[in-house]
Amino acid sequence: LDRMIAPPCGMKRIFEFSGADHVDESDLSLRVDPARPGVWRFVILGRGCWSDRVHNVFVYPRGTRPAELRAGAPGRSVAGPRLQQQAMQLVFREANGIAMRAGCEDPAFLADTSVRKARRPGQAWEEIWSATACEVTRKFLVMFTPEAGGKTRVAVVLFD
């Protein structure tokens, strides 16, 4: 799991299960009854490389077939899996561009996410996402803005 987010570090990795919640697929801050539509979010603490990391794994039940697993952004993001995917693409584009201009050829990886402005239903919220490349960590402000029709606009700016 850690290798999906960060490059190998040569140290033994230890993972601890920290909990699971059945949450709304578009708002991870909302717990929902397991009998209702949603997604399971497993929180895994990873230790052994760099600093401790909080990993989010989304589990999609598929009836009698094995569940589908998807790694989410590390840390405390409350964005749903689809919004996280959009934000990751934007953060990686910015982080890799900055790294390339500085002569770094290593791809960036996400180190952490946290909520800056709390999420309230129907309102915009902000998160801080950290990405690392060539041992340089950059922070990005990720802004999520709900729009008419149920869509959410995602924007990213450097926040160093």
Segments from the language model and where they lie:
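Cysteine-centric segments in proteins
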Residues: 1-160
